[in-house]
Amino acid sequence: MKLIIFTGLFLFAIVSLIEAEEESGRVCIPLNGECSKSPNKCCDNINCDCYLRFEKGVQTGRPCFCTEKDVIFERDE
């Protein structure tokens, strides 16, 4: 019984450490990944670009995505 409890606590500690490592900033956001909540965590040579979103003239959000540096996107009409 003690072995089962010890094993469960050990596995819980391992999972907690893995999650803490991911949140510590060592993991970067890849190309086209959303960076709205953490704009400084895009991988190397990638920028976090944001745009305003409007629906019926009302701003509904400000989504941000990791995009390549020095790339300009134009709107298709």
UniProtKB/Swiss-Prot annotation:
Main location as per UniProt? secreted
Q: What is the superkingdom listed in this entry's lineage? A: Eukaryota
Q: Which residues would be cut away as propeptide?
A: 21-26
Where does the signal sequence lie? 1-20
Which keywords belong to this entry? Disulfide bond, Secreted, Signal, Toxin
Transmembrane in keyword set: no
Q: Name one GO molecular function term.
A: ion channel inhibitor activity
> Which terms in the GO cellular component ontology are assigned?
extracellular region
Which InterPro entries does the UniProt entry name for this protein? Answer: Spider_toxin_CSTX_knottin (IPR019553), Spidertoxin (IPR004169)
Instruction: State the family named in the UniProt similarity comment for this chain.
Output: Belongs to the neurotoxin 19 (CSTX) family. 09 (U10-Lctx) subfamily.
Q: What is this protein called?
A: U10-lycotoxin-Ls1d
